[in-house]
Amino acid sequence: MSLPDPAELIRQMATDLNAHLSKRGISDPRFIGIRTGGVWVAQALLKALNNPAPLGTLDVSFYRDDFSQNGLHPQVRPSDLPFEIEGQHLVLIDDVLMSGRTVRAALNELFDYGRPASVTLVCLLDLDAGELPIRPNVVGATLSLAPDERIKLSGPEPLALELQDLSTAL
């Protein structure tokens, strides 16, 4: 399987996001990236939008519902939201949407900070493997993977996608 070029996806996502926000009458959203890949995608997206807005970052480790199964990520960092959440239009950015559990955790954390006016979900990739009813408003590409395959994003400069075969990693 050949993977798409993240730089090309980001350019298209910037166009699609502008159209989505314009259609909804949103002119000054707050941007939030989910660590770590979502922060990289958010940085690239803000650059493509030529938008100097501050970027908030979320570390959702303590909000995940699979915490007891997977344990704590070894490098938990605090979330950093340099703006109010209450009443704001938010653009929540993640790198890869798979089960939907990371986005659910991010939404739970955001609501602990306040009640946003709206949340627009932007993902570089949607793996169409959702376990929860969560879909991105703006997506770079939708891919279908075999059960033993995963996509890894490396970055931040340049962003690159790698297909990993878990069956050969054992």
Swiss-Prot record:
It is an enzyme of class 2 (transferase). The keyword Transcription regulation applies. It catalyses: UMP + diphosphate = 5-phospho-alpha-D-ribose 1-diphosphate + uracil. Its EC number is 2.4.2.9. GO terms for molecular function: uracil phosphoribosyltransferase activity. It holds the Pfam family Pribosyltran. InterPro entries: PRibTrfase_dom, PRTase-like, PyrR, PyrR_bifunctional. A motif (PRPP-binding) lies at residues 90-102. GO terms for biological process: regulation of DNA-templated transcription. Disulfide bonds: none annotated. It comes from the Bacteria. Keywords: Glycosyltransferase, Transcription, Transcription regulation, Transferase. HAMAP family: PyrR. Regulates the transcription of the pyrimidine nucleotide (pyr) operon in response to exogenous pyrimidines. Belongs to the purine/pyrimidine phosphoribosyltransferase family. PyrR subfamily. This is Bifunctional protein PyrR. The lineage of its organism: Bacteria, Pseudomonadati, Pseudomonadota, Gammaproteobacteria, Pseudomonadales.
